[in-house]
Amino acid sequence: MTHIIQESLAGQFLIAMPALNDPNFALSVTYICVHNQDGAFGLVINQSFDSVTGKTLFDQMDMPAVKAAENQTVHIGGPVHQGYVFVLHGRPMEWKASLQISDTVAMSNSTDILQAIASGVGPDPCMIFLGCAGWAPGQLEAELAENSWLTCPGNDDLLFRTPLEERWEKAAQSIGVDLNLLSGVAGHA
């Protein structure tokens, strides 16, 4: 079955509606990296591990790391491929396995970017993730039609500089939505 994508959501945020009960996505903001006829791929940007830090990650990879890299937050990117490391970052964007998402944001998952981050010469800003979120063809469109998500344009301030605990509400506020006023029941006209 062919799924026609009206407009790619790459570079946009998905904001979980308050009624979304999936524990992986409740109160989440997900940055969409890829959205096409083959499905969608994104990274949850407002959840982090309590017990996994940059030090833990770089130690497991046998990479010596500077103090700033050891203190790097490791984010829970989603429930898929939880053993894989992904990096959302600004410039420079020319790493071995990079996908430029916007003029200012790329996603990479190669060893060279991780070595650069560990050495203190990686891209700034950057966020490290374990795991990702993925949708089969048509799945994200169905979830949007069910009102599981709001969408809003991506912006670097929310992505890289807003505290994690504020991202869900700030993303909604960026499109004029007060999440506290939304009903848990969806309707269609």
Curated annotation (Swiss-Prot):
Pfam families with a match to the protein in the record: DUF179
SUPFAM superfamilies assigned to the protein according to its UniProt record, in alphabetical order: VC0467-like (SSF143456)
Disulfide bond annotation, renumbered to this chain: none
An example Gene Ontology CC term for this record: cytosol
InterPro entries: AlgH-like
Family: Belongs to the UPF0301 (AlgH) family.
HAMAP family according to UniProt: UPF0301 (MF_00758)
Name of the featured protein: UPF0301 protein Dalk_3037
